[in-house]
Amino acid sequence: MLFRSRDPEGLTKFYARIAQGALPSTSQLNTYDYMSFLESLLAQGDVLHIAFGSGMTKSVERAQEAAQALREKDPNRRLVVIDSTCSSSGYGMLVDDAADLRDRGESMETVEAWVLAHSHRIHHQFFSTDLSYYRRGGRVSGAAATIGTILNLCPLMHLNYDGRIIAYGKTRGQKNAIREAVNVMRAHAEGGESYQGKCFICHSDCLGTAHALRDAVVQAFPNLKADDIRICDIGTIIASHTGPNTAALFFMGDDRPR
């Protein structure tokens, strides 16, 4: 069964299939797909395409190949592809900020420079209470996953500077994982506890965990209110690798660790 990442009804069916034991897989767009997509946009004007991070997928290479072919076809149009080095709602947050700049009338060159300067500063902090999909993807070993499940251990992960997933620790239970995520935000967010920038949270079929994470952030950061924090579903593509019960926190801060 084929699921589209942005189909809410399909997302519900997707998680239902996972609960029944289905093992989803993903595929990426080819160069021709990108050419068709980007060419339709070029008909309307110059294009700045912010691609999903190369640390997670090679699709940015296909986008760059398509862009090169289209630039040769029409050198009068400007088409730029940027490797965001971001993923999931961190990627969405970067694009959201770029769109804000565009809507304020900033030039394409200004937006491009801002994205390049800030993409490595969007922190991706996440954890999971279900280790089976991380075992399948090689993030944790089979033995570690079994022991972790027995001991109720949550792996703590983040994206590094290049946008690759790094498992840097573990904690026992969801409450401690939430506490660690907030502590990381406190240490790395712009202005520390005075942070007042954007904050996104996403989850894979665990809305209660997302709400608990949001409440912990609001308690720790007085300038952020519950309504300021955007909570999103993890789409089918990312959830094919994380499985259910993953929650993630995104915020702007210093450079992510290399």
PLM regions: where:
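Short coil/turn segments at secondary-structure boundaries
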Residues: 21-29, 51-58, 85-86
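Short, charged beta->alpha transition segments
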Residues: 31-40, 65-67
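Glycine-rich phosphate-binding loop signature in dinucleotide/nucleotide-binding domains
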Residues: 41-45
